[in-house]
Structures are given as structure tokens and as C-alpha cells.
Amino acid sequence: MSIFTKIINRELPGRFVYEDDDVVAFLTIEPMTQGHTLVVPRAEIDHWQNVDPALFGRVMSVSQLIGKAVCRAFSTQRAGMIIAGLEVPHLHIHVFPTRSLSDFGFANVDRNPSPGSLDEAQAKIRAALAQLA
């Protein structure tokens, strides 16, 4: 069972911003920028090349929605999206507000974000999603 499955099942804490029957989105605990969100299918699938095309389409659709929300929440014109597939064996899409290419780097993540910063990001993204609905 992956760490993401444990978060989805509420066995570990997660700051969720979106949930439906197939896909969830929650904040990463090591953000590249404030608002860095992971979009994850509930089904534990190791790699994006192995996912059913319909489910992958749903994951991408939710990623697009989260991208719009993080742009609105953090006043950016762009949202970055990365599929790395190396750190956790459970398909996930990194979506984050960005202002420059320098934001695209796992070497620059905040390894110890404050709980308040994560709570603020969660609230902002949820509010932006409500406005987009």
C-alpha cells in the first residue's frame, strides 16, 4: 500500500482540496511553491503509462481544474504540471502556481513548510475552487 493510499484512506493526515469518486487532490508536504498540490487517482496505479485512458483523462481534467484554482488562489498567470513518477509508486500529478522556470525544481522544495502556510494554501485553493464551480 502506497503512502498516498494511506492518505486517501485517512490512515495518514492530508490537506485535501478536492475529492470525487475516482480522484483526489491534496497539498504536498514538500512544496516547490505555496499551493503545490498533488492530483492522485484513488486506484493505486504505479505509472502513468499503465493507467486506463479514461481514468487518466479524469486525472488530467482534475489537474486542469486544480491548475486554474492555484492560479486564482495565488495570483499567477501560470500553473506548472509535472509527472515525475519516481518518488512514490502511485500515479500523481504535481500542479503548482509558478512565476518562472526556477520554480520547476525538486531540489528547491521547502522541506519544512509551516503548518500555517499549508493551512492557508488549502483554504485559498478551496475558496478558488468554490468560485470556479
From Swiss-Prot:
This is Uncharacterized HIT-like protein Rv0759c. PANTHER family: ADENOSINE 5'-MONOPHOSPHORAMIDASE HNT1, HIT FAMILY PROTEIN 1. A motif (Histidine triad motif) lies at residues 90-94. SUPFAM superfamilies: HIT-like. InterPro entries: Histidine_triad_CS (IPR019808), Histidine_triad_HIT (IPR001310), HIT-like (IPR011146), HIT-like_sf (IPR036265). GO terms for cellular component: cytoplasm. GO terms for molecular function: hydrolase activity.
